[in-house]
């Protein structure tokens, strides 16, 4: 009986090996980084939705935001240098056919001429417009800061211990 079981197991093993086909890749992997590489310039619209854990509706726009995107060292990896005025920060991310997904980046937005200062953590993703020269950015932000606000009662400075919201922007390839 042991001999019969051994023959049956060997037959099954031979049948399994003979029927197993190697898996062929469907296509070569595509590197999407060239789609996004370039130097972009534009503006971000920030929509504040929460201040100090209270629902708020405030908005501001930052002009002259630069984003220089380069190919990273890994497959489909990108690096980005984000510049607002003289503040420059680096982040990295990945590029797919659908979007560029960036790691969080901390950015200081200091606009004394517009009476506000924010230290924000941005989480962004970008998609290319049909014209292939515009990078559409969407994301979220959180952080702190302060702003001088004009009210019917006068001018006062409002500290933002916790601020969060959404951002969007259009950056044009230079």
What are these regions (language model features)?
Residues 41-49, 103-110, 138-150:
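Generic short beta-strand segments
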Residues 53:
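Surface-exposed ligand/attachment interfaces on beta-rich extracellular proteins
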Residues 40, 76-78, 131-143:
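A short hydrophobic beta-strand element
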Residues 138-174:
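Edge beta-strand at a domain terminus
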Residues 4-8, 12-43, 168-174:
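Bacterial Sec-dependent N-terminal signal peptides
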Residues 50, 58-133:
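Predominantly extracellular/secreted and cell-surface proteins with exposed
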